[in-house]
Amino acid sequence: EGEVLVDLLRDSMLIFWPEEINKHFALEPQNYTTPAFDGKHAANEFTSQEELMAFLKKMNAASGTMHLYSAGTTPNYKYDLPLALFTTSEIPANATLAEAAKIVKGNGKLNVWYQAQIHPNEPAAGEGALVMIDNFVNDPAYKALLDKINIVIVPRINPDGSYLFSRATYDGFDMNRDHMSLKAAELAQLHTAYRLFMSEVVLDTHEFTFYGAYNDDWTSAGEYMENADDLETTPATSLNNN
């Protein structure tokens, strides 16, 4: 009874999102062109690292505002940590990430940092980041945002763990508890890249676990947040998070 009461209290804290956010949670079918939704995958398959890199290179070639970099490589499988920078500022073709960051920091616009899939078994975050990249390449409404912001999108923080479809790194380490000590090489490289931009807005995307909806009398053991719309905010990530 105690657990059900806690969940009921949590669910009773209604959150009213503005229409700009609510429209993204519509029930109408959505069509995406990212690798996992190309019609060639089984319903339980997600974008592989090879598909992710091919998709990013394709998007980069099609866009005049996207600049594709690597924030580093993973310790085990030596996968790239891809980083997509979107800006209307002129970035020389041979510019390093540090040089590109210096340019965008000097253009007076708000800097946004969007990272995904630190927990690889939360694939909606990573797939959503690829949709976001597609939008900034092909959707006029998204491209218009670049008149006001620069945005960095890191679609997959933990490629080794994504290959294994685990919550942790290859070594079994939860990087979401490592933002201060930076023991994981992947996260240390990510923070090095972040410090180049020092973005004013940071989005760290995850995916809620779904255990099943409640029965009509609210007595099931499920944990369904009926009104949260999969959007949650937290002030920080530190060593004492549990």
Model-identified regions with their sequence ranges:
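M14 metallocarboxypeptidase catalytic domain recognition
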Residues: 1-242
